[in-house]
Amino acid sequence: MAKYVIGPDVAIHLAHDEAVTRDDHQILAPALLRSQLLSLLYQAVHRGEMTHKDAERRLSYVRGLRIRLLGDRVLHSVAWKVADQLGWPDTFDAEYVALTQLQADALITLDR
């Protein structure tokens, strides 16, 4: 089974396209995905990029996806090391990298 870590940008994209994941793929994310997703959708509504109803629909869709959310001590420890090694100002992105290192085959992001 292929395991993929996704960030909130990809989660929103999946919801927008109403994508269906394959049975032989597992989606993973740090537990902080929920708060980041909520914040991104709120910001999009606040900027007038989507309606509150659209944001709720996307949030509901993502909640229905089979995403394994993780946030244990080992993940946090590795995220700290990743952020420190790369000189990042926080550990948010490092949690996604750490989870990929620990449990996944790839990190999927829309970042360029």
Regions found by a protein language model. Name each.
Residues 6, 29, 70, 91-94, ...:
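Short beta-strand scaffold positions
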Residues 1-34, 44-57:
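Short, well-structured N-terminal submotif of metal-dependent ribonuclease cores
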Residues 41, 45, 66, 83-86, ...:
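Short amphipathic alpha-helical interaction patches enriched in hydrophobic/aromatic residues
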Residues 46-49, 70, 87, 91:
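Residues in soluble alpha-helical coiled-coils and helical-bundle/repeat scaffolds
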